[in-house]
C-alpha cells in the first residue's frame, strides 16, 4: 500500500520529477528531429486529404463570415475602434514572419503559432486572443480549413475589409499537431536577451549567426525600441536590412511591409506590464491556454498591454491609406516613453485633426506614435528614398505592399503547383521558382536503352540523380529535381556537385533529351533509377525502380541565382562529403539534411548503406565503402559495420581505420558519418536489421522506396 498523499502514478517525462532518457547524456546525438516525421500525433488519420477537403469549402461563405467577425466586437477582448483588423493582421504577419531563407524553416505553412515556443514568444503576446476569436469559424468549417490557412486568410481579409486591393491568396497549408523540434531559434537562455552575452546570436561587428533572422530570442524581426532596446534609428535600419534580407525581402519590400503593417491597428502599452500573467505555456490550467492575462486591472481595450508601446501609427487606423507616410515624413518626432515604459516617438506640434481617436471613445483624440524601426525608414538614406516615393504615389505603394504581403505569406508554400483556390494569382513570380510543364508522352523504354548505351557508369547516373534531388527542402518546399536546375547557375558550379563530372554527364543527357523528346529533369532521374536497377541485378535482385514522368526544365531566366545560393549543400553525409570543417559534427549535419529532405531515421539509414556500396562518395572517396563488391546493391555496409571482428581506430578529426582484430591490418576507412550508424543505439538498431541474413531483400526494397521518395519529393501534382 502507498502512504497517504504520495503520488499514485509513475512520473513521466512531462513532469518536473523526471528528465527525458537522453538528458543524462546531453552530448549524445539527438534523433528527435527525425522522429517528428511520425504520424502518430496527427488525429486525422493516414487517409485524410486536406486537398480533398478544400474542394468542399465554400470560399465565399467563409470570407463573408470572416468579414462579419472582424466587426463583431466581443466583451472579453473588445476590438479597437470596433474592428479586429489590426489584431488579425499582426497574427498573420507574425505567423509568416518567422520564415528564414537559410534553411526554409519557420513561416506560416504549418500553423505552428499554436504551439510552443512560438505561441509564448513575447512578440506574440495576445495573439492567443486572435486565434480564440477565430475559433467559431474554425469550428464551423472544420476540416475544410486548416489553422495555418485560416490565420493567413484572416490577415488578408482584414486588409481587404479596410480598403486594400490584395494580390491574391492560396489555400493549401497543412497543420502540424505538435511543436517543431528541428527549428533552431537561438541559444539564448532568456527571452529578449541582449547581444554580447553568453549564447549571443551575434559575433564580431554585429554579425548575426546563421540561420537566424530575428535579432532577439522571442522576437519576429527587429526590436521596435532599438538595438538591444536602445533607440538609434540608423542602427535599427542596419538590423532591419539584415533581418528582412534573411526573410527574402529587399529594401523596397522592407519599407512596404513595415509601413503597410503599421498603416492599420495600434500598439498596446497603456498600463503596467508587471500586471500581466505568464505566457500560454506557463499559464495556470484554468486559463485554458490563454496567456498574458491581467487580473489586477481592467487590461482590455484602451487599457490593454501587449508590446508595451502605446498608440496608433496613423490618423485612421482602420482604413488603408497613405496616412503612415503623411505623419512620418511631415512631422518631426521626439523620443519619449509609453505608459508601460517602452521607448517610442511622438510628433512635435501635431495638428489635432491628425491625431487618431481613442479606441473606445471617438470624442477623444490620442497622440500617434512611431517605433525606432519606423523612424529608421525616415533616417536611413535608402529607406528614405523609397518612403518618399511611396508617399507621393499611393497606388504604387499599395501595389508594392500587396505583392510583398503575398510573398511574405506564401514564401514557404513552395511552387505554384501547391496553390489552391479561386484567388490564386495567374502571374508567375520568380521567387516561386517557376517550372514549365514537362512532356509526358515519350517512349520510356527507348530512353532507357539510350541511357544504358551511353557509356555512363552506374555511379555517374546515381550520383547525378541524387545531387539533383537532394536540394529539396520540406521546410519551404524549394529545390529538388524538377526543373533540372542542376544544369543552371548557380547549381552547376557548386563544389558539392563536382562541376566537371556533372558537365560530362549532362552533355550525354541533353543529347538523349533532344533525340527522345524527354526533359532533362526526367532523364536525370531515369538514369539514376537505371543505375540502381543494374546494381540490384548484380546482387541477384531483378527489380524495377518506380518512375514518375512529367518533370519540366527551367531556364536561367526563371532562376534567381542569389535566391538559390542558400540551397547549396555545404555537407552531404549521404555522399560522405564536407565542404570544409565545421563546428557542428558531420553526423549532426547529416541529421539536418535528412530532416530537411523529409526523411525518417530508418530511411536515412538504408539510404546511407546503399549509397556507400554503390560507390557514390564525393570524388570517388573509399571512406565508408565497406564492401568487396562496389557497385552492387547489397547490405555489405551493415554486415561489416556490425562485425565484431573489426576495431575502429581514429586517424584524424574525421577519419578512422577499420582494423582486423587478429591481424591489425587495415581493412577499410571511414568517417564519423559512417561510424555513427554503429555507435548510436537507435541507428545501430536499424543497422542490425539490415545486416541480418534474412533481410537482404528487405534492404533492397527499402532502399528503393526511400530513393523514390527523394526523387519524387518535389512532384506536388
UniProtKB/Swiss-Prot annotation:
Cofactor binding mode and count: Binds 1 heme b (iron(II)-protoporphyrin IX) group per dimer.
Modification after translation (UniProt): Formation of the three residue Trp-Tyr-Met cross-link is important for the catalase, but not the peroxidase activity of the enzyme.
UniProt cofactor(s): heme b
Catalytic activity: H2O2 + AH2 = A + 2 H2O; 2 H2O2 = O2 + 2 H2O
Catalytic residues (positions): 94
Linked residues for Tryptophyl-tyrosyl-methioninium (Tyr-Met) (with W-93): 221-247
Signal peptide: 1-12
UniProt key word Acyltransferase: no
The protein's name in its UniProt record: Catalase-peroxidase
Species name: Polynucleobacter asymbioticus (strain DSM 18221 / CIP 109841 / QLW-P1DMWA-1) (Polynucleobacter necessarius subsp. asymbioticus)
Lineage: Bacteria, Pseudomonadati, Pseudomonadota, Betaproteobacteria, Burkholderiales
Gene transcribed to yield this protein: katG
Amino acid at each position: 500500500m502507498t502512504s497517504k498523499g504520495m503520488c499514485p502514478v509513475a512520473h513521466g517525462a512531462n513532469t518536473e520529477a523526471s528528465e527525458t532518457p537522453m538528458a543524462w547524456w546531453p552530448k549524445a546525438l539527438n534523433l528527435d528531429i527525425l522522429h517528428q516525421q511520425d504520424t502518430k500525433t496527427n488525429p486525422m488519420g493516414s487517409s485524410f486529404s486536406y486537398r480533398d477537403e478544400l474542394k468542399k469549402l465554400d470560399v465565399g461563405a467563409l470570407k463573408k463570415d470572416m468579414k462579419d467577425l472582424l466587426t463583431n466586437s466581443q466583451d472579453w477582448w473588445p476590438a479597437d475602434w470596433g474592428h479586429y483588423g489590426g489584431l488579425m493582421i499582426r497574427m498573420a504577419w507574425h505567423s509568416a514572419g518567422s520564415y528564414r531563407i537559410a534553411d526554409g524553416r519557420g513561416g506560416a505553412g504549418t500553423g505552428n503559432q499554436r504551439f510552443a515556443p512560438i505561441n509564448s514568444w513575447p512578440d506574440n503576446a495576445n495573439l492567443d486572443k486572435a486565434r480564440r476569436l477565430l475559433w467559431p469559424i474554425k469550428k464551423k468549417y472544420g476540416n475544410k480549413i486548416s489553422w495555418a490557412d485560416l490565420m493567413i486568410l484572416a490577415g488578408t481579409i482584414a486588409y481587404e475589409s479596410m480598403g486594400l486591393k490584395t494580390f491574391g491568396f492560396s489555400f493549401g497549408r497543412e497543420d502540424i499537431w505538435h511543436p517543431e523540434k528541428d527549428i533552431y531559434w537561438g541559444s539564448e537562455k532568456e527571452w529578449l536577451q541582449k547581444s554580447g552575452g553568453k549564447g549571443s546570436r551575434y559575433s564580431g561587428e554585429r554579425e548575426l549567426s546563421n540561420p537566424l533572422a530575428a535579432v532577439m530570442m522571442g522576437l519576429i524581426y527587429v526590436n521596435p525600441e532599438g538595438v538591444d532596446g536602445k533607440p538609434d534609428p540608423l542602427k535599427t535600419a542596419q538590423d532591419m536590412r539584415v533581418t528582412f534580407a534573411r526573410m527574402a525581402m529587399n529594401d523596397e519590400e522592407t519599407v512596404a511591409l513595415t509601413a503597410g503593417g503599421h498603416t492599420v491597428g495600434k500598439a498596446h502599452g497603456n498600463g503596467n506590464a508587471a500586471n500581466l500573467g505568464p505566457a500560454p505555456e506557463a499559464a495556470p490550467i484554468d486559463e485554458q491556454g490563454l496567456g498574458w492575462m491581467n487580473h489586477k486591472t481592467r487590461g482590455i481595450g484602451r487599457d490593454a498591454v501587449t508590446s508595451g508601446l502605446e498608440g496608433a501609427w496613423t490618423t485612421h487606423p482602420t482604413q488603408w491609406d497613405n496616412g503612415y507616410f503623411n505623419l512620418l515624413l511631415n512631422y518631426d518626432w521626439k523620443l519619449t516613453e509609453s505608459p508601460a515604459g517602452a521607448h517610442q516617438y511622438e510628433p512635435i506640434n501635431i495638428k489635432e485633426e491628425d491625431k487618431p481617436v481613442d479606441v473606445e471613445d471617438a470624442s477623444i483624440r490620442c497622440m500617434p506614435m512611431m517605433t525606432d524601426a519606423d523612424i529608421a525608414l525616415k533616417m536611413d538614406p535608402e529607406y528614405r528614398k523609397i518612403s518618399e516615393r511611396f508617399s507621393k504615389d499611393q497606388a504604387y505603394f499599395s501595389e508594392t505592399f500587396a505583392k510583398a504581403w503575398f510573398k511574405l505569406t506564401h514564401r514557404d508554400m513552395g511552387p505554384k503547383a501547391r496553390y489552391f483556390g479561386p484567388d490564386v494569382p495567374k502571374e508567375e513570380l520568380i521567387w516561386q521558382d517557376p517550372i514549365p510543364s514537362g512532356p509526358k508522352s515519350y517512349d520510356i523504354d527507348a530512353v532507357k536503352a539510350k541511357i544504358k548505351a551511353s557509356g555512363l557508369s552506374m555511379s555517374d547516373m546515381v550520383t547525378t540523380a541524387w545531387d539533383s534531388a537532394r536540394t529539396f527542402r520540406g521546410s519551404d518546399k524549394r529545390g529538388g529535381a524538377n526543373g533540372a536546375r542542376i544544369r543552371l547557375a548557380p547549381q552547376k558550379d557548386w563544389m558539392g556537385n563536382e562541376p566537371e563530372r556533372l558537365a560530362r554527364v549532362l552533355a550525354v543527357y541533353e543529347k538523349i533529351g533532344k533525340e527522345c523528346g524527354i526533359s532533362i529533369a526526367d532523364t536525370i532521374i531515369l538514369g539514376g533509377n537505371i543505375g540502381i536497377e543494374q546494381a540490384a541485378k548484380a546482387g541477384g535482385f531483378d527489380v524495377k525502380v518506380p518512375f514518375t514522368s512529367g518533370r519540366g526544365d527551367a531556364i536561367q531566366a526563371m532562376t534567381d541565382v542569389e535566391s538559390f545560393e542558400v540551397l547549396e549543400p555545404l555537407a552531404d553525409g549521404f555522399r560522405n562529403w564536407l565542404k570544409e570543417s565545421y563546428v557542428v559534427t558531420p553526423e549532426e549535419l547529416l541529421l539536418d539534411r535528412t530532416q530537411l529532405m523529409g526523411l525518417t531515421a530508418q530511411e536515412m539509414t538504408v539510404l546511407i548503406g546503399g549509397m556507400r556500396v554503390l560507390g557514390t562518395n564525393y570524388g570517388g572517396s573509399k571512406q565508408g565503402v565497406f564492401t568487396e563488391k562496389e557497385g552492387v546493391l547489397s547490405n555489405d555496409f551493415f554486415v561489416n559495420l556490425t562485425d565484431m571482428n573489426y576495431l575502429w581506430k581514429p586517424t584524424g578529426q574525421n577519419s578512422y581505420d577499420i582494423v582486423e582484430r587478429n591481424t591489425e591490418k587495415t581493412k577499410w576507412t571511414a568517417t564519423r558519418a559512417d561510424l555513427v550508424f554503429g555507435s548510436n543505439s537507435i541507428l545501430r538498431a536499424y543497422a542490425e536489421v539490415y545486416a541480418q541474413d534474412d533481410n537482404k531483400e528487405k534492404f533492397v526494397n527499402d532502399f528503393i522506396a526511400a530513393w523514390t521518395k527523394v526523387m519524387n519529393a518535389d512532384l506536388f501534382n
